[in-house]
């Protein structure tokens, strides 16, 4: 019995030893599983932040398309307007609605969108007028049935008829004066022009922005697309002054600069050869290889002046093969707040590209997200853009996320 008991004790000792060894192995397995789960979670987390991680801290990268909202404005064949130039009723927004300006008026977001009638076929062949739409939430809009800005029998008719008034951008002063830049198109020459308003419906046209600069030297030069420098003051986006002057970036092929003391008469800055000073140009092999066209009003931030712009991609070897040839994508650049002509940094990749079907079909099927309107509303930034020269859509950036 004693010998037998000894044998049993030895077996128990061996069994205990095996149990301990098994326990250690199990713990190691559990630890390995835990490490793998942690690694997977980390990878997933990095994946979720990949979009913003590849952009510098000065950029506003995370603009999101609100689900089930876009496009927010589409053509309407049921609205008619008596055109003072044709002296006839026209379906003024029957063909295309696109390229919107945006601002805030009386607590509501107001979008001024370019609308084309059905008078002809082809880009730039119809007459453009500006429609008015307002929204409480920046997403759902109520439209007026007639345009608020159009070619008329006024001082600007020779410069605006028959092509119309195109591609507006609008910003507001602290005392509530709305300043709009738009393109006058008489189908001979495009000119950047200025208009002002207190209510966004009744406008005073001031004519070409550069009419008086350098004794009228540039009044007949091709010009368009202006981004006035703005800033946030007490939650309101207003036109800013730098060194006692107003500043704007402008230009289609290149980004140029101009200044003003009254917001109506603008003086373009010139280089050593007396030509328009180029502060940003297209880059070979990039999404903006063909042109760099100014977008919505620029924003003065704690990092500098943030300019959102439109880049067009060249076809072939000179373009960026990651994006469709001739497509328009949205880029961002940072300029020095003390010297607005000094480019500090620039994104190598677009922060917003054509994705939805209506952004890749219409007048411009190569794909277009053409940004022109930017407003701060309900603690968020709303970016309004044209889709393939045919629709209007919105994207939202929440700076608190």
Question: What do these predicted regions represent?
Answer:
Residues 15-52:
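Bacterial Sec-dependent N-terminal signal peptides
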Residues 46-99, 103-163, 171-290, 299-364, ...:
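Beta-rich carbohydrate-recognition and catalytic domains
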């Amino acid at each position: 019995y004693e010998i037998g008991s000894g044998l049993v004790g030895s077996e128990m000792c061996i069994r205990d030893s095996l149990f301990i060894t098994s326990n250690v192995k199990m713990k190691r397995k559990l630890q390995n599983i835990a490490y793998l789960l942690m690694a997977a979670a980390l990878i997933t987390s990095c994946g979720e932040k990949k979009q913003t991680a590849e952009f510098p801290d000065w950029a506003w990268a995370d603009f999101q398309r609100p689900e089930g909202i876009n496009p927010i404005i589409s053509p309407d064949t049921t609205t008619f307007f008596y055109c003072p130039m044709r002296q006839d009723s026209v379906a003024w927004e029957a063909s295309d609605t696109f390229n919107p300006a945006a601002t805030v008026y009386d607590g509501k977001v107001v979008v001024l969108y370019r609308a084309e009638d059905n008078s002809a076929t082809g880009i730039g062949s119809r007459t453009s007028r500006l429609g008015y739409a307002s929204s409480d939430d920046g997403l759902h809009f109520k439209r007026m049935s007639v345009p608020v800005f159009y070619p008329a029998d006024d001082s600007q008719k020779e410069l605006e008829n028959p092509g119309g008034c195109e591609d507006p951008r609008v910003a507001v002063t602290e005392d509530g004066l709305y300043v709009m830049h738009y393109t006058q198109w008489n189908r001979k020459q495009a000119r950047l022009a200025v208009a002002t308003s207190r209510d966004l419906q009744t406008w005073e046209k001031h004519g070409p922005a550069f009419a008086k600069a350098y004794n009228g030297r540039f009044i007949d030069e091709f010009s368009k697309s202006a981004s006035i420098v703005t800033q946030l003051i007490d939650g309101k986006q207003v036109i800013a002054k730098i060194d006692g002057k107003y500043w704007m970036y402008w230009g289609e092929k290149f980004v140029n600069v101009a200044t003003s003391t009254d917001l109506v008469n603008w003086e373009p800055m010139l280089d050593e050869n007396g030509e328009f000073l180029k502060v940003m140009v297209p880059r070979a092999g990039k999404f903006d290889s063909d042109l760099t066209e100014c977008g919505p009003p620029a924003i003065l931030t704690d990092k500098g002046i943030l300019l959102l712009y439109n880049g067009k991609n060249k076809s072939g070897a000179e373009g960026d093969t990651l994006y469709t040839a001739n497509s328009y994508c949205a880029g961002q650049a940072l300029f020095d707040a003390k010297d607005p002509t000094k480019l500090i940094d620039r994104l190598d990749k677009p922060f917003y590209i054509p994705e939805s079907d209506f952004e890749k079909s219409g007048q411009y099927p190569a794909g277009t997200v053409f940004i022109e309107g930017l407003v701060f509303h309900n603690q968020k930034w709303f970016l309004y853009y044209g889709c393939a020269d045919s629709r209007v859509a919105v994207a939202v950036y929440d700076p608190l996320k």
